[in-house]
Amino acid sequence: GGLSLLGGIILLSLAAHTFSIQTMIEKVSDIQNSPFFILAMVLVMIGAFTKSAQVPFYIWLPDAMEAPTPVSAYLHSATMVKAGLYLIARMTPIFAISEGWVWTITLVGLVTLFWASLNATKQQDLKGILAFSTVSQLGMIMSMLGIGAVSYHYNGTDSQVYVAGFIAAIFHLINHATFKGALFMITGGVDHSTGCLLYTSPSPRDQRG
């Protein structure tokens, strides 16, 4: 993921002759007419999907739940998993002209949302439940960014869809960081008090209600 992102940024810099994202946006026509455009777009998406744990690159995030509680809270709520989402939001003015960008981001986000939600219901470890719920929320935000980018194809960047999609995505990004960090700290309190994080109810459905 990191190497893909590095490759994408290098290709963008070759097309725009700068490493500044703001300047790249100002030179968006040069980038879109560059032979590097498609490859750069694919590499940036791969980098973003791995950083924000999208399907099929999500497995590292549930594994990270084994870390100490403060580390888990940071990984699952702060900059670590939000970096890919921020990258997609910043790069949308450059790549949204491509339908491939819009459809890929939207569909990957939706698949991640439903796949991770389903897996969360199968977990018995409290941290596992929270980890997969984090993946599903990241998928929701990713799909919001994709839906917001649809406006580039019919009414420009000032359309209500674009504004609503991106405001919703950024709001939920901040909202998710707040409640998920708190939930992981609460889970740490449960672990400290009981010495166990396994949910052992006779009826697994109790944890889903």
Regions found by a protein language model. Give the residues of each.
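...captures the hydrophobic TM-helix bundle architecture rather than a specific catalytic motif
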Residues: 1-205
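N-terminal low-complexity segments that are often proline-rich with Ser/Thr-Pro
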Residues: 207-209
